[in-house]
């Protein structure tokens, strides 16, 4: 008799994806609950660690967002998106499993802070632009 165990990356990947897939409800831009698909991958396993969005494509927000994107890109696989409403951009990243979305808005231009949104809790916190890389690093690679 021959025992031939099989344990490949395919099965582990499928197990992670099946465990992470979730459908829940979250408020849209108008405060109405909408169904959303979320890939709740552990931040260490998520292929894209963060996404950077300017709230609108004017008033200097894209330039600030692109600078932040370039700074994050040095340490992490990050995504930049400026197409469509910010709520839709959040939903696209939720589906892709991106744990954190960073939004540059009007307040960012005044006080040099951005909003970091957590995919799982939907919590949003303001963080100084200069601290974003270390903040994402602490969240993605906790000690």
State what each model feature region is.
Residues 1-143:
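NTP/phosphate- and nucleic-acid-binding module
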